[in-house]
Amino acid sequence: MLQKFLICLSLIFTLASANLFDFLNNQFQGGNGGGGGGRHQNGGSKSPQQHEEAMLNANCNTYLCPDTGICVDAPKFCPCPYPSSQLRCFLPDGRYVCISKPAGYGIADKYNDPQTNFKIDAKDDNIRDCGWVNRAWRNEKLKK
């Protein structure tokens, strides 16, 4: 009787483990067996090859933004890939970086306007905005 119980228990454990590993494999490899890093290949996303092909065949006579594939007059006009959740912060050397917008009660609303959000400096090193990026670039800290 004990042997049958142990056999049944080991069978159940084996099946549960197989299902768990299959679930984890789909989560971390995008379900396509190709190491997608958690990205699912659905209608809205492109494979790296499709992205490269679209970039190479883009009809742009000025500047093609590498992150978004949008045609603009100059690199400084490239938008961030996720403008609703990112700030475009200009560096002193003319380049820019996209960072996550600050979040929190009473803070996030200040950063909603893309025409002015890069100008805001909370003057607080605990709030990661464009002012913080520029201080980090210059290796400065706020004096307390």
From Swiss-Prot:
Keywords: Signal. One of its GO terms (biological process) is ERAD pathway. Residues 1-18 form the signal peptide. It comes from the Eukaryota. InterPro entries: LCL2 (IPR034543). Coiled coil: none annotated. The keyword Transcription does not apply. Belongs to the LCL2 family. PANTHER family: LONG CHRONOLOGICAL LIFESPAN PROTEIN 2. Probable component of the endoplasmic reticulum-associated degradation (ERAD) pathway. This is Long chronological lifespan protein 2. It comes from Lodderomyces elongisporus (strain ATCC 11503 / CBS 2605 / JCM 1781 / NBRC 1676 / NRRL YB-4239) (Yeast). The lineage of its organism: Eukaryota, Fungi, Dikarya, Ascomycota, Saccharomycotina.
